[in-house]
């Protein structure tokens, strides 16, 4: 399955992978740790992508 993907699907999955990052440390320091996570974090097992 890893090789046999459409290019468009692979690009969408790569975009989702880039978006699934934690909040930078400097943001947490700047907001005095009020912002620890962002609501679009996605766990690979809990929430599946619709791609």
From Swiss-Prot:
GO terms for biological process: translation. One of its GO terms (cellular component) is ribosome. It comes from the Archaea. One of its GO terms (molecular function) is structural constituent of ribosome. Pfam families: Ribosomal_L39. Gene3D superfamilies: Ribosomal protein L39e. HAMAP family: Ribosomal_eL39. This is Large ribosomal subunit protein eL39.
């Amino acid at each position: 399955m890893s090789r046999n993907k459409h290019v468009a699907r692979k690009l969408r999955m790569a975009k989702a992978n880039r978006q699934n990052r934690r909040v930078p440390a400097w943001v947490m320091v700047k907001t005095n740790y009020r912002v620890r996570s962002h609501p679009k974090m996605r766990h690979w097992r809990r929430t599946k992508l619709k791609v």
